[in-house]
Structures are given as structure tokens and as C-alpha cells.
UniProtKB/Swiss-Prot annotation:
Molecular functions (GO terms): 4 iron, 4 sulfur cluster binding; iron ion binding
Alphabetized NCBIfam families for the sequence: PRK11190.1 (NF008392), YhgI_GntY (TIGR03341)
Record keywords, A-Z: 4Fe-4S, Iron, Iron-sulfur, Metal-binding
Gene expressing this chain: nfuA
Pfam families from the UniProt entry: Fe-S_biosyn, NifU
GO biological process, one term: protein maturation
Role according to the record: Involved in iron-sulfur cluster biogenesis. Binds a 4Fe-4S cluster, can transfer this cluster to apoproteins, and thereby intervenes in the maturation of Fe/S proteins. Could also act as a scaffold/chaperone for damaged Fe/S proteins.
Origin species: Haemophilus ducreyi (strain 35000HP / ATCC 700724)
Subunit composition and interactions: Homodimer.
Record's protein name: Fe/S biogenesis protein NfuA
Record: residues binding [4Fe-4S] cluster: C156, C159
Cofactor(s) needed for function: [4Fe-4S] cluster
Keyword Iron in annotation: yes
Length: 199
């Protein structure tokens, strides 16, 4: 299938072995299904379930692995681009991990307008880092003199660390990604300190 060349989903050897072990206990010809609930939204969640042969749809895309296949529905497919499934063992035991960087926002083309590519990087790389502080950044506009105007929300609003975060973290990251298209970032939010501020 054409789409399989574009969309890449990787399952580590450990995770493949784990799936094979689980599937041996199921009916013959049972595979796995990888899906996204609420794809393209901040509340997107990925999951893996068993997929009996009679549950495969014509519109599904099949990814073949040793001893089993992973099926992905048409709606979830673009949001699972570059997804990685691993089976990690540590002192606390073993668990399956599923990283899908594009689940909350569809992957965009390299030749998409600059503002779309910039927003994609903010949503998939910057905001996940800020989420640990309960904060987020929204791209408001890109000025003619190549400055990205950003609005901080959540725990970042009124945070005394914003200048440091903005200049050192986000600006550095975005300039490294877009060295010719961007000169810097500016903050549009009037930072009023409130009880929800992290620092």
C-alpha cells in the first residue's frame, strides 16, 4: 500500500516478542490494532487492542511484523506517523510504552506554509515540555520581520521564569529548527502573576 511508505510505525523487538506471547493465547489469526481516540486534539490518546481477523476493515492499513500484523484504521493512520511502541522492563516491572508524537496534531508536509510548520513544532515539541508545569504556548502570528508572537497560558501565565523559558528554551529551539525563517520570539501575554503560576 502506498500509505505504508509514508507512515512509519516502529515496534521494538522486545515489544514484538511481548505481542507474540500475548497473541499465542488468543484465537488463531488474531492480530493487534493500534488506534487513536480523539485524534488531532489535546486529549488524544493512543491504544493497542486485539484484532480478530473478522474485525479487519477494507480501509485498514496493515503493518507486517514477524509472527503478527498491526492494523490501523483510516482515521488514526496520519496521527500515528512515527509512532514507537516499546516494552520496557525496570525495577517496577515491565510495561508497554507507546509514543505517538503526531497523535495530537497531524504531521504536516515539509513544503507547508511556514506558520503551519512552526505551529506544528510548537504543538509537538515545545508544549509537551511545558505541560509538566501545566503551561502551554499558542502561536498568535509571525510578523513581517520574522518574529513569532507567542501567547503563554496555564501555569506559564504570570510565571517569573517566562523570560528565561522564552529566551533560552523556546527561542533557542525554534531558531535551531528554522534558522533562516525566524529571527526570534516575542511574548504577547501580559504576565499577571496569579495563584496558578509555577514560580
Amino acid at each position: 500500500m502506498e500509505q505504508q511508505e509514508i507512515i512509519h510505525i516502529s515496534i521494538s523487538e522486545a515489544a514484538q516478542a511481548h505481542f507474540r506471547c500475548l497473541l499465542e493465547q488468543q484465537e488463531p489469526n488474531t492480530h493487534i490494532r493500534i488506534f487513536v481516540v480523539n485524534p488531532g486534539t489535546p486529549s488524544a490518546e493512543c491504544g493497542v487492542s486485539y484484532c480478530p481477523s473478522n474485525a479487519v476493515e477494507e480501509t485498514d492499513t496493515e503493518f507486517k511484523f514477524t509472527g503478527f500484523s498491526a492494523f490501523v484504521d483510516e482515521l488514526s493512520l496520519p496521527f500515528l506517523a512515527d509512532a514507537e511502541i516499546d516494552y520496557v522492563t525496570d525495577q517496577m516491572g515491565a510495561q508497554l510504552t507507546l509514543k505517538a508524537p503526531n497523535s495530537k496534531m497531524r504531521k504536516i508536509a515539509d513544503d507547508a506554509p511556514f506558520i503551519e510548520r512552526l505551529d506544528y513544532v510548537i504543538q509537538t515539541q515545545v508544549n509537551p515540555q511545558l505541560a509538566s508545569h501545566g503551561g502551554q504556548v499558542t502561536l498568535i502570528e509571525v510578523t513581517e520581520d520574522k518574529y513569532a508572537i507567542l501567547q503563554f497560558g496555564g501555569g506559564c501565565n504570570g510565571c517569573s521564569m517566562v523570560d528565561v523559558t522564552l529566551k533560552e528554551g523556546i527561542e533557542k529551539q525554534l531558531l535551531a529548527t528554522f534558522p533562516t525563517e525566524l529571527k526570534g520570539v516575542k511574548d504577547v501575554t501580559e504576565h499577571q502573576r496569579g495563584e496558578h503560576s509555577y514560580y
